[in-house]
């Protein structure tokens, strides 16, 4: 479950830009094109607040159907940016489908915090930065695999 994977999530200290953004996924989504990157970042900035509001309102009104739909839309919106945030949104969608509304509050709070962080991490984002981050992430993955 995503909540178990992200419960202790913290952005890497002293490593600006590394955190929730998944550079490999984002590079694939924009095809390595700066104009496309800027366009999808603008879409996220425009839509994310509305999606988060819809999720919060649906839960506050205890409307499981609306919550599931809002979480699904949120998941689709963030999937190109963060596999972590998308996984939490997917968990929220699953909880709403099961009618587990009380259990959904911590996920909504996590998504709101992650949403703010994603927007901050997009400031000054460039193809070059993403490529550097993707390389650093690959180096960390190789190091972890080698040390096992």
Which ranges hold each PLM region?
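Two-component system phosphorelay core
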Residues: 1-148
